[in-house]
Amino acid sequence: MKKRKSCFIWLLCILLLVTVLPAVDFTDVQAASVSSTFTGWKTFGGKKYYYKNGKKLTDLHKIGKYYYCFAADGTMLTGWHRIHNRFRYFGKQTGRMRINQTVNGRKINSKGVWTPVVVLDPGHSAVVAGGYEPLGPGSSQLKEKDTSGTQGVATGVEEYKLNLSIGLQLRTLLQKRGFKVVMTRTNSKVALSCIDRAKVANKANADAYIRIHANGSDNSSISGALTICTTRNSPYISSMYRKNKALSEAVLNAYVAATGCRKEYVWETDSMTGNNWSKVPTTIIEMGYMSNPSEDRRMQQSSYQKKMVRGIANGIENYLIK
């Protein structure tokens, strides 16, 4: 009986140790065993590290003939990453930075930098393009070339002004992050049809075409953001569905995460002329409802606009390199 009781106590002690004591990170244990004079490669837990005089390297470094990059914990990076606001690719197996190559259709220059192109389209304008245009290539259905957009129910601010403000701020942030940015408009004095805007994106061969809008509804209680893309069975550009959907999801998720606004959904529809005529990855971001007094006021706050801009930028980047 005493023997059974003793075994039970030992078993209980072992269980307590397992549940109470912190898990041992054997990678850290192995790393701690590296000599203070060691310089070279080490692999722990399937991850590669480079040591110089016993210390893990972090950031971008030239080792021998090649450049490598290491995360803050020293892990060797692979794939696409934005390093010091420049987009670079590191081989999946070797971790070597690529130069003078094309990877996934993306041209990398002699300095190891790929510069993604983003076209920003601040929706609407003070001067509205009159008349009608085909809904999509080859379509007999016509739709207005543009509309005046909506207006803030509480602030009175026209949508085209908000769209342009966000677009210009977004351009600045994206350029700082290493993007090339093309704008469909930088003022509100020009009338542009939806096809005109799509042509700008097509000519630039954009890696992402972001159409910036704000929403409106007869129901003033509705709030939140949504994105819009073409459908899987689009009669105009079905080949772009996968990329359009992925871009729409990435932008919406990042925008909601940055702003904390209500998340609606990705609306798949072939009723948007600008989307139908675009030959590059495209989404419309409806940033919020100007028909909701609270959301309307919020979207005019500079602090909130910074969150809006950061969210869209993060979404574009997530789509391109993750």
Question: Which sequence ranges carry the predicted segments?
Answer:
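Extracellular adhesion/carbohydrate-binding repeat motifs centered on closely spaced tryptophans
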Residues: 4-116
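Soluble non-cytosolic domains of exported or imported proteins
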Residues: 157-165, 191-195, 238-246, 299-307
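Active-site-adjacent substrate-binding region
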Residues: 240-268
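Sec-exported extracytoplasmic/periplasmic mature domains
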Residues: 168-180, 202-207, 214, 252-261, ...
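Mature extracellular/periplasmic domains of secretome proteins
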Residues: 194-207, 272-278
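Active-site histidine-acidic residue metal-binding/catalytic motifs
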Residues: 113-198, 204
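Active-site-adjacent mobile loop/cap segments within catalytic or ligand-binding domains
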Residues: 211-219, 228-231, 263-322
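A short, glycine/acidic-enriched catalytic loop
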Residues: 131-154, 217-245, 250
